[in-house]
Amino acid sequence: MRIVAFASTQQKELNMNQYQNILLAVDFSDHGQAVAQKAQSLAEQFNAQLHIIHVLDNIPMPDTPYGTVISLDEDSSDDLLETEKNKFIRMSDQLGIAAQRRWLIWGEPQQEIIRLAAQERIDLIVAGSHGRHGLAVLMGSTASGILYHAQCDVLAVHL
């Protein structure tokens, strides 16, 4: 595992003691646990609140507009959605993340991660990087999009 950190362009110097809210963006890839452990370690190191987001973009939800927060308390008739919810809840529980800092959202990952980071005043986004094309070869398309558009620092954990 290799770690690549990017400071936001608005921040003149990187002062990691200022991190109070860290957002872990998960996609449940094979190496996602390594990204989660890094985010948890940073949250502990800086005594920061750890938030978690998983953006559903692979499940057909024709009557659901992008940006809709999926309830973790309601059962769904869609088996794939229930599987994703259960993985998300299990990881959130393992990391000890409080319910009010858990975000399961239907939409486009880059857009929803950036929107939530601004909404929740996130200081650092931690995401895995495992893309295959263009700049994404280095970072992953979602991670590279977050890097260029987020208003906070981004930590890309190379998988």
Regions from the PLM with identified roles:
Residues M1-S8, R115-L159:
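Gly/Ser-rich helix-loop-strand patches that form or flank binding pockets
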Residues Q40, I89, S144:
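Active-site phosphate/pyrophosphate- and oxyanion-stabilizing loops and adjacent acidic/basic residues
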Residues I53, R101-I105, L155:
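General small-molecule cofactor/ligand-binding pocket signal
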Residues P60, P109-E112, G134:
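Generic structural signal for helix capping and beta-alpha/helix-loop junctions
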Residues I3-N17, S92-I125:
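Structural beta-alpha unit
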Residues L14-I70:
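Small/aliphatic-rich secondary-structure junction motif
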Residues I70-E84:
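A short acidic, glycine-rich active-site loop
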Residues T83, L104-E108, H130:
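Short beta->alpha linker loops
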